[in-house]
């Protein structure tokens, strides 16, 4: 089993916009996804710290960019959840603008972990986010979350469907199933992150 270097993640800061982020150097990997895709749960599972990222029953609660430090050069970035219907349109547009700005401007960004509920993958905003990333040739790893909610064969079919959808970009897009509840897929995620962060 890979050594989990992510269990030493500590909260660094929150930022409302890109110009409030730390210096653009080192390594960042960003976690993004629709509200209620299980992003906070996945981060807590990865870091083995159930209190690291705030989980909420109210989708859209995380409106800030939250950064967690792994060491002096490496950070995990929790981007605001998107796509929740009950949030005011101007707030939604502000979020989308910040997401786009972060993905386009941040030079230290090494990859995007995009979380989708395995039961409802490939929503419009998910595809927009992947397209933004591909536009700057940024690797995207899609985590199909809540895999414990479906049978094994249903999960396998969902993974295959998303892989096929992005087969023309397979050099940049990878896909896996993930369950925070059962901790399924954690080792695969850690192996990928280790490559992106270039741990020596």
Swiss-Prot record:
Give the source's domain of life in one word. Answer: Bacteria
Positions annotated to bind Mg(2+): 40, 62
GO process annotations (BP): division septum assembly
Name the needed cofactors: Mg(2+)
Q: Keyword set for this entry?
A: Cell cycle, Cell division, GTP-binding, Magnesium, Metal-binding, Nucleotide-binding, Septation
| CDD domains noted in UniProt | YihA_EngB
Q: Where does GTP bind?
A: 33-40, 60-64, 78-81, 145-148, 178-180
Signal peptide residues on this chain, from the entry's feature table: none
Residue stretches making up the EngB-type G domain = 25-199
Give TM regions: none
Q: Does the keyword Magnesium apply?
A: yes
**Xref: InterPro entries:** G_ENGB_dom (IPR030393), GTP-bd (IPR006073), GTP-bd_ribosome_bio_YsxC (IPR019987), P-loop_NTPase (IPR027417)
GO terms under cellular component: cytosol
Pfam families in the record: MMR_HSR1 (PF01926)
Q: Name one GO molecular function term.
A: GTP binding
Q: What does this protein do?
A: Necessary for normal cell division and for the maintenance of normal septation.
- Alphabetized PANTHER family for the sequence: ENGB-TYPE G DOMAIN-CONTAINING PROTEIN, MSS1/TRME-RELATED GTP-BINDING PROTEIN
Family, according to the entry, reads as follows: Belongs to the TRAFAC class TrmE-Era-EngA-EngB-Septin-like GTPase superfamily. EngB GTPase family.
What name does UniProt use for this protein?
Probable GTP-binding protein EngB
Q: Which organism is it from?
A: Legionella pneumophila subsp. pneumophila (strain Philadelphia 1 / ATCC 33152 / DSM 7513)
* Taxonomic path: Bacteria, Pseudomonadati, Pseudomonadota, Gammaproteobacteria, Legionellales
């Amino acid at each position: 089993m890979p050594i989990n270097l992510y269990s030493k993640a500590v909260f660094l800061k929150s930022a409302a916009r890109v110009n409030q982020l730390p210096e653009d150097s080192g390594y960042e990997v960003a976690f993004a996804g629709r509200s209620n895709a299980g992003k906070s749960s996945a981060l807590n599972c990865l870091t083995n710290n159930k209190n690291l990222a705030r989980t909420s029953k109210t989708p859209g609660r995380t409106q800030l960019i939250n950064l967690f430090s792994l060491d002096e050069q490496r950070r995990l970035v929790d981007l605001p959840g998107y796509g929740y219907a009950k949030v005011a349109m101007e707030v939604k547009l502000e979020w989308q603008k910040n997401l786009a700005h972060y993905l386009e401007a941040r030079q230290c960004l090494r990859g995007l972990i995009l979380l989708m509920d395995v039961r409802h993958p490939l929503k419009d905003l998910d595809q927009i986010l992947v397209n933004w990333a591909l536009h700057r040739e940024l690797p995207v790893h899609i985590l199909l979350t809540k895999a414990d909610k479906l049978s094994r064969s249903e999960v396998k079919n969902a993974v295959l469907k998303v892989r096929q959808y992005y087969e023309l970009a397979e050099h940049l897009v990878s896909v896996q199933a993930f369950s925070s509840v059962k901790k399924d897929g954690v080792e695969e995620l850690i192996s990928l992150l280790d490559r992106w962060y270039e741990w020596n």
